Regions:
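Flexible loop and strand-edge segments within Gram-negative outer membrane beta-barrel domains
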Residues: 73, 77-116, 144, 154-163
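Membrane-spanning beta-strand positions in outer-membrane beta-barrel proteins
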Residues: 1, 29-31, 71-77, 123, ...
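Transmembrane beta-barrel wall of Gram-negative outer-membrane proteins
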Residues: 8-39, 43, 47-86, 114-118, ...
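Extracellular loop and loop/strand-boundary signature of outer-membrane beta-barrel proteins
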Residues: 3-6, 44-50, 103-108, 117, ...
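N-terminal/domain-start segments enriched in small and hydrophobic, helix-friendly residues
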Residues: 1-5, 63-67, 124
Length: 168
């Protein structure tokens, strides 16, 4: 069967996903799906006249199960996700007045991520024991940019990048 989901909310929040499940035979089945999420944001950066906390996120997943023999099961999963997010709606705090200013800074603070996860679960059922193996791989590439003085002045900012590949 197929599942389709669509939702909407305040502040331009939208989500949609579709997943299809299919049993091809007694020995093979799979599912495949994807999603998209959008949020326009709630907090405004007064200096840039843009919403700070927007979200664009999309991804997909494939899972397949194969039973080549009565004793052997192979379960493969592949997931991908991309995120593009704004963040950090902070305003400067004034001790003398006890008030926090509206967020207003010169650099847009963002987070971008590409993430791939794959795994292969292998299970062999012998007469007196079960042998299980899980093999996985993850690829992560992301970038964080942040205005750290939280003002219209160009004093402090950070950019952090990472790229990781993990095999287990």
């Amino acid at each position: 069967g197929t599942d389709l989901r669509v939702s909407a909310g305040t502040y331009n929040q939208y989500n949609t996903s579709v997943t299809h499940y299919h049993r091809v035979s007694e020995k093979f089945a799979f599912s495949a799906g994807g999603f998209y999420e959008y949020a326009g944001g709630f907090f405004e950066n007064k200096a840039l006249d843009k919403n700070i906390d927007h979200i664009h996120s999309t991804g997909g997943r494939i899972r397949s199960i194969f039973l080549p023999t009565a004793n052997l099961k192979l379960d493969l999963n592949v997931n991908y996700e991309y995120n593009d997010q704004g963040g950090y709606p902070y305003g400067l705090y004034d001790k003398s007045t006890g008030k926090t200013a509206d967020p207003a800074y010169n650099l847009e603070s963002t987070y971008h991520r590409n993430l791939v996860n794959t795994s292969l679960n292998t299970e062999y059922n012998a007469r007196n024991f079960t042998l299980t193996s899980v093999t996985g791989f993850q690829y992560l590439k992301d970038r964080l940019m942040m205005d750290q003085d939280f003002s219209v002045a160009d004093k402090y900012s950070i950019m952090q990048k990472q790229k990781q590949q993990t095999f287990s």
